[in-house]
């Protein structure tokens, strides 16, 4: 039988601005969300979709973007983002986060004027850089273990199944179109002359959740008023059936319907990754693995000479490098150049438990390139490492507010992880450092840093510059994955580029005293993320692989049934790691005390 899978999406054009609210603890001025959106065309193909992604990157993501820079300067949001909304018919969503709704008209004007200017002649260097990001991504896709799933997810419903396998051909075609008017015409047809449009803003409301609860209570009260004895009896019977179902053990017949792997189908040997340690000017760890011509470079600098407060500021410096002016290039030009020579540039911290006593503290500098562009890519990364300028207060505040916005946007999706790390930070030194530099502790520090950069910029910059000069020393190890020929060349590039690094200063001990601690952190969410943790070493126990099996069983079915099936949380479980930390968690949980009782029942 033929089935009709066609799903129609109405092409609405909203002439009036749509106003809404969002939950907030405090109703502050300048914390509104501004949105400009429109739908893409119907029945789009892969070429159309790839063009959208390239243009989104070139027009809105690059630091050279005129639209982005004007919005940051005039609208002054905490963050400005552009994304494709997925569905049967995609949407382009442009959002200014934590801005003033009084500037909404100007926000719309900047976007629409930017479209008109771009369709007259888009910045070709931004276009080349955006395109280069996709080319690197496709090379990585060729060697990814997830490539099958990725190709499947790229398939658009009701389109040819093998359409996504033609992506390289489409990219070749789109590259050749950069120096034509294809992209300008695309902007005019799909952005400017688009028959759909939505302009929206949301203001903070401290009564949002209370009002929603009141609406729900009124709805339930109305249901109860109209409830018949017969309907009430049916509901009670269904609840009883649900309780019986939840508490009933599965029969052997029911268990047999669950797909399982036979134990003999599970490999018992771990595939060995090729690894060679080479002592040269620096220590190199080399992996001879097929990379489809890509070169993966990670430099690890020992930063054991930095204290905890300096490490906190280092997390800010990591966001500044590559996003502020250097001695040779303004930040508004960096992206246009950078992504033509490399992809995935990253400055970050890494902390490794060497043993129970020692934690290696490392600064990681990494990027991906090819042999044709690796030397230029290394030059650019070194420029960020040694020649960055931190004297632009407005730009520094933009980056700090963006960092805060990113954390706030993602905190509810990873609330259970933040809760576990925060709980463990009171009993484990490594997790304490992790929390202070990437968890709740880092968020609290970030808010203080924004105030410091705003009220006493000279003092703030003084700290940043002093720490910046101490980061990169000759205590360096390099991890490279590439072909043997490419590795040999890149090793020479690195030896030459980092020939004059300073010697590392003495090691600084970071103090820590474990303590039992109960803590509650208030958020705008109307659900909870709960964690209770312990270190098994305090009970004279050591980590054992059997503990992983035990936590798996305790997570599902035990905690799953108590906290999710019966308690209404989105998720719950317990984890264990090699440091001996046992961590329970619940995710988007409507309860608190009931969940803690469930943890205690273990």
Annotated model-derived regions:
Residues 2-64, 139, 147-160, 224-322, ...:
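His/Glu-based metal-binding/catalytic segments typifying zinc-dependent metallopeptidases
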Residues 130-288, 417-511, 518-520:
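C-terminal regions of mature proteins
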Residues 26, 84-86, 192, 287-289, ...:
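Generic marker of residues within folded, mature protein domains
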């Amino acid at each position: 039988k033929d089935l009709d899978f066609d799903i129609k999406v109405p092409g609405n054009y909203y002439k009036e601005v749509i106003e809404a609210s969002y939950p907030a603890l405090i109703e502050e001025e300048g914390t509104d969300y501004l949105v400009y959106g429109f739908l893409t065309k119907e029945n789009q193909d892969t070429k159309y979709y790839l063009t959208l992604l390239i243009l989104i990157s070139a027009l809105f993501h690059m630091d050279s973007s005129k639209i982005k820079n004007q919005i940051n300067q005039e609208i002054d949001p905490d963050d400005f983002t552009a994304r494709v909304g997925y569905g049967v018919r995609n949407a382009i969503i442009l959002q200014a986060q934590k801005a003033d709704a009084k500037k909404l008209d100007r926000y719309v004007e900047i976007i629409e004027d930017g479209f008109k200017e771009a369709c007259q002649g888009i910045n070709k260097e931004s276009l080349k850089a955006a395109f280069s990001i996709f080319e690197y991504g496709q090379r990585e896709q060729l060697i990814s273990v997830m490539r099958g799933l990725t190709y499947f997810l790229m398939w658009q419903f009701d389109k040819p199944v093998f359409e996504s396998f033609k992506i390289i051909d489409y990219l070749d075609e789109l590259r050749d179109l950069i120096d034509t008017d294809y992209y300008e015409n695309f902007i005019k047809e799909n952005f400017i002359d688009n028959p759909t449009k939505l302009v929206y803003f949301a203001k903070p409301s401290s009564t949002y959740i209370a009002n929603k609860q009141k609406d729900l209570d009124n709805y339930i009260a109305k249901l109860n008023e109209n409830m018949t004895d017969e309907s009430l009896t049916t509901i009670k019977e269904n609840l009883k059936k649900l309780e019986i179902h939840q508490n009933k053990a599965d029969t052997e017949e029911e268990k047999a319907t669950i797909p399982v792997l036979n134990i003999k189908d599970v490999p018992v040997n771990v595939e060995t990754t090729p690894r060679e340690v080479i002592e040269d000017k620096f220590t190199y760890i080399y992996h001879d693995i097929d990379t489809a011509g890509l070169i993966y470079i990670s430099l690890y600098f020992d930063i054991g000479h930095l204290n905890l407060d300096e490490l906190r500021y280092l997390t800010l410096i990591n966001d500044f490098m590559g996003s502020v002016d250097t001695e040779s290039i303004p930040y508004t030009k960096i992206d246009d150049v950078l992504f033509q020579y490399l992809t995935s540039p990253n400055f970050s911290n890494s902390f490794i438990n060497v043993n129970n006593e020692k934690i290696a503290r490392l600064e990681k500098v990494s990027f991906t390139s090819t042999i044709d562009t690796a030397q230029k890519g290394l030059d650019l990364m070194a420029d960020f490492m040694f020649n960055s300028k931190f004297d632009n207060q407005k730009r520094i505040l933009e980056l700090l507010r963006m960092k805060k916005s990113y954390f706030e946007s993602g905190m509810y999706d990873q609330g259970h992880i933040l809760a576990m790390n925060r709980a463990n930070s009171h009993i484990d030194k490594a997790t304490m450092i992790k929390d202070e530099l990437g968890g709740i502790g880092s968020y609290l520090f970030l808010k203080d840093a924004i105030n410091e950069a705003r009220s006493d910029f000279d003092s703030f910059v003084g700290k940043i510059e002093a720490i910046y000069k101490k980061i990169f020393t000759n205590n360096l190890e390099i991890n490279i994955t590439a072909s043997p020929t490419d590795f040999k060349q890149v090793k020479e590039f690195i030896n030459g580029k980092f020939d004059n690094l300073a010697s590392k200063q003495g090691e600084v001990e970071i103090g820590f005293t474990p303590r039992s601690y109960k803590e509650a952190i208030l958020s705008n969410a109307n659900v909870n993320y709960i964690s209770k943790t312990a270190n098994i070493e305090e009970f004279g126990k050591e980590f054992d692989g059997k503990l992983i099996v035990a936590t798996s069983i305790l997570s599902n079915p035990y905690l799953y049934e108590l906290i999710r099936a019966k308690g209404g949380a989105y998720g719950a479980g317990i984890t264990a790691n090699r440091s001996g930390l046992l961590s329970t968690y619940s995710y988007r949980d409507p309860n608190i005390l009931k969940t803690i009782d469930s943890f205690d029942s273990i």
